Amino acid sequence: MAIERYFIKEGIKEMLIDEYLEKELRRAGYGGLDIKKTPLGTKVVIFVERPGFVIGRGGRKIRELTRILERRFNLENPQIEVEEIKNSYFNAKVQATRLAQALERGVHFRRAAYAAIRAIMSNGARGVEIRISGKLTGERAKSVRFYQGYIAKVGNPAETLVSRGYAQALLKLGVLGVKVSIMPPDARLPDEIEIVEKPIEEEVSEQ
């Protein structure tokens, strides 16, 4: 039980750090993080589109982030590495944030989702799924799922080959949740299948 509680605690801590960095580094095109314990402390890899925003002038910003991770989140001797995202169209967190920003600007949810899927697929993704949930058109909350191509749903391929991201859009009707799953072009399944090109599909479910 002690080991289970430790992993739960560490998982919650990583989630809180992720939420903080998402807000703090939004202009940098934040795309997630990876935290690993090392003999020297804690290695924190931050994935962004624009590394300069994270490093700051003379390294000021990255030193500030290091202090916050150590003092506010109790990370032991955090060592931050900043890694540039090579292709943001395959980073689900970046795409979820972009979609949420489009919704906040007043773009209709269906138009925003279709545009995102077309852009992601045209860059070579094997599959993409977008789910937008909340009060989309009226008082009743519902969830709309848009998808094209192939996304692994279960087993090791779903855990290792699929990029997943989540963001929130704050609108007058309330908060919308945006979930994005992307299977990049280099994802290879154990039992390779041929993917037949299909148009974007849509499903609606009441909440």
Swiss-Prot record:
Please provide the Gene Ontology terms (biological process) for this protein: translation
SMART domains xrefs: KH
* Tagged with keyword DNA-binding: no
Q: Identify the residues that the record assigns to the KH type-2 domain, covering every copy.
A: 17-86
Disulfide-bonded cysteine pairs: these are none
User: What superkingdom heads the lineage?
Assistant: Archaea
State the Gene Ontology terms under molecular function: rRNA binding; structural constituent of ribosome
Report keywords, A-Z. Answer: Ribonucleoprotein, Ribosomal protein, RNA-binding, rRNA-binding
Matches recorded under InterPro entries: KH_dom, KH_dom-like_a/b, KH_dom_type_2, KH_sf_prok-type, Ribosomal_S3_C_sf, Ribosomal_uS3_arc, Ribosomal_uS3_C, Ribosomal_uS3_euk/arc
Question: What's the stated role of this polypeptide?
Answer: Binds the lower part of the 30S subunit head.
Query: Mind telling me which NCBIfam families this protein's record contains?
Result: PRK04191.1 (NF003219), uS3_euk_arch (TIGR01008)
Question: What is annotated about its quaternary structure and interactions?
Answer: Part of the 30S ribosomal subunit.
Give the family from UniProt: Belongs to the universal ribosomal protein uS3 family.
Q: What is this protein called?
A: Small ribosomal subunit protein uS3
Species this chain originates from: Thermococcus sibiricus (strain DSM 12597 / MM 739)
Q: What is the lineage of its organism?
A: Archaea, Methanobacteriati, Methanobacteriota, Thermococci, Thermococcales
- Which gene does this sequence derive from? rps3
